[in-house]
Amino acid sequence: PHVLQLSTHEHAWVFQLHDPECRAVAADLLSRQGMAKAGFGLGDDRKRIIEKLGVEPAEILELNAVFRAQGYRKDMGVKGAVAVLFNQRFQKSKKAATSNWASERLSESQLVYAANDAYAAYRVWDALGL
């Protein structure tokens, strides 16, 4: 991955992993015990994190698996989860989604996209009471 985004209720962080300082902080956060990290579509990311950051991610929760365990048959992404849990539509910019995430400097729209994505996953995790 080129970018790692994390969120709490109050703050969101977007780490560009080409930057050595960002990589070091991201590696520390991802490998830290006692801190849950949750998201959607994390299967491939785990392998790439190990390769790129040299750490084994700890306490990672694939939210799609939670929905599957609750009986949902189809994959549940963040948009579907927001619809199910909050009865709201979560819009994601196709332009930002398909933009160059390896860029030296992310645009404001990319930062907003990444932060919103992380915050939405946090809200889903929180609403599920996990």
Predicted ranges, named:
Residues 130:
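Short arginine-rich
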Residues 1-127:
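Conserved DEDDh/DEDDy metal-dependent 3′-5′ exonuclease domain
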